[in-house]
């Protein structure tokens, strides 16, 4: 499989971390990047206080993610990034300058994702911020570089479907 920049996107609690990390494990030279770990402290503090991020908070974070993905590609790895990438402008910004990229959108209902979030512990993202994420979400338009998956499936089914799709695109 040729090296592409792969982003697993969706609202908080949809399973990005689970799917992206396992997908990276199953890809030859795959490397997992947890987008949340690249947030600057001020973004984490804002979210921890229950304040949704706005676009002015995100651009420097995206620049850090892009730089990390480019480094991994230069090392011969396939970066698999877990990142909300809620708006089309965010996705356009992330993929600008990458000749090969793939987007995997994990899709689920508010009620299902809220129930999952209420059952887990997260450093700063709470189910209270989920409504703002759904409000900000711009569902990606159909595209050859896009795979949309329903999170009603098991994580293993999601990962295997994504892996097979990526192989079919190489």
Kindly label every feature range from the protein language model.
Residues 5:
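Walker A (P-loop) ATP-phosphate-binding motif of ABC ATPase nucleotide-binding domains
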Residues 119-161:
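Small-molecule kinase domains that catalyze NTP-dependent phosphoryl transfer to phosphate-bearing small molecules
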Residues 11:
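P-loop (Walker A) phosphate-binding loop of NTP-binding proteins
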Residues 21-64:
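Conserved substrate/cofactor phosphate-moiety recognition/catalytic segment
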Residues 8:
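Hydrophobic anchor at the beta1->P-loop junction of P-loop NTPases
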Residues 16:
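Conserved lysine of the Walker
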Residues 57-98, 102, 106:
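Glycine-rich phosphate-binding loop used to anchor ATP phosphates in small-molecule kinases
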């Amino acid at each position: 499989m040729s090296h592409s920049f792969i982003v697993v996107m969706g609202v908080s609690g949809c399973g990005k971390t689970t799917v992206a990390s396992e997908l990276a494990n199953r890809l030859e030279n795959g490397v997992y990047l947890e987008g949340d770990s690249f947030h600057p402290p001020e973004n984490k503090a804002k979210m921890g206080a229950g304040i949704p991020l706005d676009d002015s908070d995100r651009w420097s974070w995206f620049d850090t993610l892009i730089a990390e993905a480019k480094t991994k590609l230069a090392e011969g790895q396939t970066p698999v990034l877990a990142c909300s990438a809620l708006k089309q402008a965010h996705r356009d910004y992330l993929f600008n300058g990458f000749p090969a990229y793939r987007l995997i959108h994990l899709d689920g209902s508010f009620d299902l994702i809220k129930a999952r979030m209420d059952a887990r512990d997260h450093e700063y993202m709470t189910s209270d911020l989920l409504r703002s994420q759904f409000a900000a979400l711009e569902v990606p338009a159909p595209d050859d570089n896009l795979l949309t998956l329903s999170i009603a499936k098991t994580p293993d089914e999601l990962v295997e479907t994504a892996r097979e799709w990526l192989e079919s695109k190489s």
